[in-house]
Amino acid sequence: MNKLVKNYLNIPIIETERLILNYPIETDFKILELFLKSERSKFVGGPYRSFSAWNDYMANIGHWSLYGHGLWSLRIKDNNEYIGRVGIIKPAMFKEPDLAWQVFKDYEGMGYAYEAAIAVKDYTIHNFKFSSLASHIVEGNKNSISLAERVGYKIKKEEIIDKKKFIIYFHM
C-alpha cells in the first residue's frame, strides 16, 4: 500500500462509494509512466518517452499550484491502489476548463471512471466559478465519448487543436 505524503498544495480529497480521489504522490509516477508509454495513451498525446511522461506528471502538479485544480490520483478505497487520474485541467490551447479522465487498462469497464467523473463534476460545480465545463475528446476515442455522454455532457462543437480533431462536450 502506498504511503501518503504531506499534501503541500492542500489539494482537496474526494471520496465516493468505492474510490478516493487524492493528491498525486511520487510513487504514482512509475505506474502512470507505464500507461503514458503504452499505445493506450494515444488519445492523450502518447505514447510518450520517459522524460515526456515525467513532464506530463509534473505539469499536473503545476496545474494544482497555478490554478487550484488538476488531476487527482484515482485510488480504490479498499486497498489504496492507484488506478488512474481524473480532474479538471486547462491547457493553454483549450478555451474552457476540461474534465479529463484516464483509467488504467485493468480497471476499465468497472464504472470507476464514471463514478470519479460524476464526483469531480459535482465538486467543480459547487467549488469553482467556471462559466462552462467541457471535455475535449480526440476523435475516435469511443470509450471517452461514451463516458462523456453517460456523465450528461452534450456535444457542442468540433475543433482542430494542435493538428488533432477534438469533439468538445459541454456540461455548463
Task: Please identify what each model-predicted range represents.
Residues 1-43, 58-62, 71-172:
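Acyl-donor (CoA/ACP) binding surface of acyl/acetyltransferases
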Residues 49-68:
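Active-site rim helix/loop that mediates acceptor-substrate recognition in acyltransferases
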Residues 48-49, 112:
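Short, surface-exposed alpha-helical recognition segments that flank or form part
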